[in-house]
A protein has these predicted regions:
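Structured, hydrophobic secondary-structure cores that serve as assembly/anchoring elements
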Residues: 1-19, 28-30, 135, 167, ...
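A short linear-motif detector with a strong N-terminal bias
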Residues: 13-18, 41-45, 71-73, 124, ...
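A broadly used, surface-exposed interaction patch
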Residues: 15-52
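Residues in well-ordered beta-strands of folded domains
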Residues: 38, 65, 301-303
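A glycine- and small-residue-enriched flexible loop/hinge signal that marks low-structured segments
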Residues: 47-222, 254-269
Length: 317
């Protein structure tokens, strides 16, 4: 099923499943634009060769959540499948999974518990869909940190130290501020940042970087690959198109204004040498203008802008 509103939820689904989908549509600032629903038999188990994963690989979506009774083994299967999709096929899929130490920017390890809603208590698995919908309904300029869940009456409350410890472990937890329940710091499960920076731990930043990657990739596929001669001037035309896109992101305060996009001279130099073309006496401009067959080498630098989260206020008398 492809749903764009709660009015489209199939009446043939069980009451619990209908309620689960409604929670997804609760969103945050906005509801999710679209919710994909795959219905499995009660006895089905999510495995590496499951039809649901084959189907998902043909769909376009941002966040995935399993059934409310997903097991640890099934969550592990989804993690492995999703990371393979990202590494092998440039997918931008991400997942919200319960109590899963994944150490990946693409997996949100939701660790909420004792989630009380209208007399019913949910565990982390039962509320992953709600969290996935909340993230999907959060504008790119915002993070989910301290996003409220107004329907939640109470949770298993954590101390400040326990919350900090959970965040350090890459867990997304819920926080009760004494009046309402809201999300803790909007982090994914990444804890090992070798070769990366700490910004990859933030749900907001990864969502932005995935969007940029996909937008640029689709623009190149739809408007450039196979459609233009691979001349220097046409390479600059592509550079200009990407730069205009990045300028729009900077105008929306999604990235800093010091972005850059241009021909990757080092990569182009290395390719020319691999083809047997000596470059030692070539100027940088000559390397840029050299014939590179079907290949285009670009380098892009962006500096993502995070949301306001850590505020220190000193009051003096």
């Amino acid at each position: 099923y492809t749903l764009t509103s709660t009015a489209q939820i199939p009446a043939t689904l069980g009451v619990a499943n209908q309620a689960s989908i409604r929670r997804v549509f609760s969103g945050n600032t906005n509801p999710p634009k679209k919710v994909l629903v795959y219905v499995m038999d009660a006895a089905d188990v999510i495995a590496a060769d499951s039809a649901v994963l084959t189907w998902l690989a043909t769909q376009k979506f941002d966040y995935l959540a399993g059934p409310d009774d997903i097991t640890a083994a099934e969550a592990g299967v989804i993690k492995t499948w999703l990371l393979n999709q990202r590494s092998d096929y440039h997918a931008i899929y991400k997942a919200v999974l319960p109590d899963l130490t994944a150490d990946s920017e693409a997996i949100v390890d939701f660790a909420g518990s004792g989630i009380l809603v209208d007399g019913t208590t949910f565990d982390a698995a039962g509320y992953c869909g709600r969290i996935a919908g909340l993230i999907a309904g959060t504008p790119m300029r915002q993070s989910i940190t301290y996003a409220a869940l107004p329907e939640v009456d109470d949770i298993d409350r954590l101390t400040s130290l326990e919350m900090d410890t959970a965040v350090g472990k890459g867990q997304l937890v819920l926080y009760h501020d004494g009046e309402k329940v809201k999300c803790g710091r909007g982090v994914n499960s990444l804890t090992t940042v070798t070769g990366k920076s700490d910004i990859w731990k933030k749900i907001k930043i990864v969502e932005l970087l995935d969007m940029v990657q996909q937008d640029i990739r689709l623009t190149i596929q739809d408007n450039y690959i196979g459609k233009l001669p691979n001349t220097y001037d046409n390479k600059l035309q592509l550079v200009t198109a990407i730069s205009v896109y990045l300028q729009a992101l900077a105008k929306d305060d999604l990235i800093a204004s010091d972005f850059s996009c241009g021909i990757d001279v080092d990569a182009q130099d290395a390719w020319l040498q691999e083809q047997g073309t000596p470059t030692v006496d070539m100027s940088e401009q000559e390397i840029k203008e050299a014939n590179t067959g079907t290949h285009v080498f670009l380098s892009i630098y962006i500096n993502p802008i995070d949301a306001m989260e850590d505020v220190a206020v000193n009051i003096y008398l």
